[in-house]
Amino acid sequence: DGTTILANETKFKDGSLLSVYTDITDLKNQEIELLRLKNAIENVPVIVQYWDENDNLIMANNKANEMHREMGIKCEFVKGLFYEDMVRAQLSSPFFKVPDGETIETEIKRRKQYRKSVQSNYREVFLENDSTWYVIDKRLEDGSFLSIFSDITEIKNKEKEHKRLADAL
């Protein structure tokens, strides 16, 4: 009938036996749902990063590591990664530009201040390889922070081409 029972038996020195049966059907169903959610997050064509309230990485999907590998950024998205270390690695690469008049450390400070103050935000990020990313940042009720990054370079290039054609008319 789909019920999952956990059986636990303990034999005592006098030879008696204690048997405890626990219905863990709900736990098994939740486990299946969590695995399905994890699979969905791993297979969406966007980068998903989930950080705790102290800016330590809870999880990131494989797409995040793929992007860093493709760009030669020496930072792997592993549980516990500190946000500041990720930003420092990105800003040390040729793909992420430190704003004029700033240093890596002042840019890290600015980004940390942004993260502390933002509740929900949508923004575009332009990288030095001419790619454009649409970023959604959301502070959750428990203080954790969710960021979703979508590569919109093709869309932006088509918009430029349409504008160029429209201007030519």
Question: What does each model-found stretch correspond to?
Answer:
Residues 22-33, 150-164:
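PAS-associated C-terminal cap
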Residues 13, 53, 62, 128, ...:
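Short, ordered coil/turn segments that flank beta-strands lining enzyme active or ligand-binding pockets
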Residues 32-62, 66, 161-169:
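PAS/LOV and related PAS-like sensory modules
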Residues 1-5, 109-133:
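Per-ARNT-Sim (PAS) sensory domains and their PAS-associated C-terminal
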Residues 1-8, 19, 135, 164-169:
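Intrinsically disordered, low-complexity linker/propeptide segments enriched in Ser/Thr/Gly/Pro
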Residues 1, 11-25, 46-116, 139-152:
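PAS-family sensory domains
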